[in-house]
Each structure stands twice: as C-alpha cells, then as structure tokens.
C-alpha cells in the first residue's frame, strides 16, 4: 500500500510539473505564459509566413509580443534556433494604413501594448543585429524565417 501511494504521489508530481510547460504545446514547440511558440527556418515573405502560421491550426499567427518578458523569451528562442543566421525573423505586426504609422493590432487581433521599433517601413521583424531583442521594419516582400504563436492546447 505504501508503495502504491509513493508511486501515485510521484506521478502527481510529474503531472503537475508538466502543466504549463511544453506538454500543452505541439511537439517541438515552446511554451511561455499560456502560449506556444515555434521559430521556423523557412524563408518566406511576411504575408506567406502569416499564411503558413494560420494553416498550422485555427488561431495560430505570426507572434505578437505584448510584454518585455515575452520579448525576452521570443528573442532567446530565435537566438537559439537561428544560430549563425544572416536573416531577421518576422513577427506578426505590419503597417496596414496609408498614413505611415504602426497598426494598432497584431495579426492575432491583440492590441499593441509593447513595442521596440528601430525604424519605419511596412512589416516588422526581430533584428538579428541585436540578437532578436529589437524590432526592425523591413520590406514585406523580403524573405525571412518567422515565429508562429498560438494559445496552449487543452
């Protein structure tokens, strides 16, 4: 009986330690604060990258970044995946207005509440020169790796 309780307790500890981690995300995706992320090394235009993300599953988009903690997590993920890359990495922000100012929403519909922009063009990526810690504006037709984001799976 004591051994059964010990094994049951051990399984409970393992289950609880996995909750909120990558266990809730698809294989090879990383988990952070209730979302799943994956850096894709495929080179795509901003629009093709967003289309690729949305084709993975319902509700998935290019990554939105809503806090400095999330920015640091995504930058580390990109740096680890895109080692020795000569490319920037697309995120889910693009200027859709004709007034040359930043859109107020990410591709997943969430509001822009955190930003670190280095200069203006049309689509936004993470700047490889800053180890993906700063945003950079790039021509939307450039081909770059990209980061998809979704809610954790339940």
From Swiss-Prot:
GO terms for cellular component: extracellular region. Its main location: secreted. Expressed by the venom gland. InterPro entries: C-type_lectin-like (IPR001304), C-type_lectin-like/link_sf (IPR016186), C-type_lectin/snaclec_domain (IPR050111), CTDL_fold (IPR016187). Residues 32-149 form the C-type lectin domain. Pfam families: Lectin_C. It is found in: Secreted. Keywords: Disulfide bond, Hemostasis impairing toxin, Platelet aggregation inhibiting toxin, Secreted, Signal, Toxin. Residues 1-23 form the signal peptide. Disulfide bonds join 25-36, 53-148, 123-140. GO terms for molecular function: toxin activity. Heterodimer of subunits alpha and beta; disulfide-linked. Inhibits ristocetin-induced platelet aggregation via binding to platelet glycoprotein Ibalpha (GP1BA). Belongs to the snaclec family. This is Snaclec dabocetin subunit alpha. The lineage of its organism: Eukaryota, Metazoa, Chordata, Craniata, Vertebrata.
């Amino acid at each position: 009986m004591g051994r059964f309780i010990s094994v049951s307790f051990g399984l409970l500890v393992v289950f609880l330690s996995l909750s909120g981690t990558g266990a809730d995300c698809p294989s090879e995706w990383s988990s952070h604060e209730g979302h799943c992320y994956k850096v894709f090394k495929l080179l795509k235009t901003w629009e093709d990258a967003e289309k690729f993300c949305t084709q993975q599953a319902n509700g998935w988009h290019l990554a939105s970044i809503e806090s400095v903690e999330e920015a640091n997590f995504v930058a580390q993920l990109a740096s680890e995946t895109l080692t020795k890359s000569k490319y920037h990495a697309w995120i889910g922000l693009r200027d859709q207005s004709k007034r040359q100012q930043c859109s107020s929403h990410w591709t997943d519909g969430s509001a822009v509440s955190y930003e670190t922009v280095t200069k203006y063009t049309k689509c936004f990526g993470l700047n490889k020169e800053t180890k993906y810690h700063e945003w950079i504006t790039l021509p939307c037709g450039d081909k770059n790796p990209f980061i998809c984001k979704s809610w954790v799976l339940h």
